[in-house]
Amino acid sequence: ESASSLQTVLEAFQEKFGEFRPKMKWINMGGGHHITRADYDVELLIKIIRRFREKYGVEVYLEPGDAVGWQTGFLISSVLDIVHNEKDIAILDTSAEAHMPDTVLMPYRPAVRGESENGKFTYRFGGNTCLAGDIVGLEAGDAEYKFDSELKIGDRVIFEDQIHYTIVKNTTFNGIKLPDLLLLKENGEVKMIRELDYEEY
């Protein structure tokens, strides 16, 4: 995710796999580099790549990764029901498993518009599949969201920065409808790009 992390990885790579370097013509430094994030050290990344390329005489590749779509889209869902099972769980018309796989497979908890660090009302967000673990942010160990006011059936829940996985890695698990893709223009106009229906399943 960061240039300093890449530097650490490359040092370990050189130490453990240095014997293979003379046979290499190129190296892929992978994806996941958040180069479009405001606090990303782009200058350090450039130095790392130049130094490696010049030292070993190899071509260096970076995969585009989610930086291409960083902060470019959100996932809008609605509360279908609210149940209590030791904790309040808002059941959504979206699914962590089918629409936000990074929130199930990785220690990642997406931000939700309107959440409040000191809010009095705490919820977990459950998906609309039959999967027991279809809970947003469960793998991150922080699956609870706080709000200043109670959620109600029909309320919208907007997950920030979700386009990078919601569009490219979603599934129709359990026959769950894929999210529609809309474009929000700078003037506020909303344009339907693709509406997905049961035929897609």
How does the language model describe each region?
Residues E1-H84, N174:
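Active-site loop/helix belt of alpha/beta enzymes
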Residues I48, E59-Y201:
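Charged (often Lys/Glu-rich) extended helix/loop segments that serve as interaction or gating elements
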